[in-house]
């Protein structure tokens, strides 16, 4: 049984995704959130763009779009999904801060924070694909993107699952100041 139709999911993604950056900017301008939180949100957006744009450019050899988007311009859907990725990233930061009782991981490498962020990113990606794959898009199974699990006839492929792990690991590599 599906909780949401493809059309309902598409409109939810469209509204939430395109409202999120505006909300963060307004909250910052009204001094309700810090510049740090605003920057973390947009860092998450840029993390999302690092795979949303390549997914779009890969085209039909990698995935198919199954539903028309309200604004049918190149990359609009992918940019909107990146705005949602920013929200997912912020939740990961919140979870790491909650479990670790500190935000030091934002300034220096912390393997526990990395684990929390990777776990959250992978779990959220799994839920997103479980609900969106086969309704909004369809990832194509091939030699470089095999199906790792099938649930109710929905084959989830490996590359979308690995994305958050690679992104978070890259983001948290220690750098010299």
Q: Predicted regions span which residues?
A:
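Internal alpha-helical transmembrane segments of multi-pass membrane proteins
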Residues: 102-122
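Hydrophobic alpha-helical membrane-insertion segments
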Residues: 43-48, 115-129
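A generic, lipid-embedded transmembrane alpha helix
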Residues: 44-60
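Conserved small/polar residues in nucleotide/adenosyl-binding loops
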Residues: 169-175
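Hydrophobic alpha-helical transmembrane segments
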Residues: 79-89, 152-168
